[in-house]
């Protein structure tokens, strides 16, 4: 089980990701932060190719919803994934695949998930 917070400070505009999980070394494969662009987590049977694509889309300035859409449509295993993104404008978007555990989901707020 993994708990993740992705957010943007409304005052400083800084972005960040925090994770708590049983899996070792997720910090090497799940979170992505590009300062002044976006922050994200690509998790639940993480695929490094998705993390790289997420990084590319963030760098191109895609908004959070479009990043989620692109990642979900490019991944044949999307039902196994959980992805969350907060962009530089404070937009939050997420998807939780249908094949995640019984206790899986996401909550979106203004500049956080």
Spans of features found by a protein language model:
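N-terminal nucleophile
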Residues: 1-113
């Amino acid at each position: 089980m993994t708990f993740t917070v992705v957010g943007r400070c409304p005052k400083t505009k800084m972005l960040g990701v925090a994770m708590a999980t049983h899996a070792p070394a997720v910090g090497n494969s799940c979170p992505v932060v590009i300062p002044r662009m976006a922050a994200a987590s690509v998790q639940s049977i993480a695929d490094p190719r998705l993390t790289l694509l997420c990084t590319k889309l963030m760098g191109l300035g895609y908004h959070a919803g479009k990043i989620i859409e692109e990642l979900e449509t490019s991944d044949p295993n999307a039902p196994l994934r959980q992805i969350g993104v907060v962009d530089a404008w404070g937009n939050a978007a997420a998807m939780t695949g249908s094949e995640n555990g019984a206790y899986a989901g996401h909550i979106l707020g203004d500049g956080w998930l």
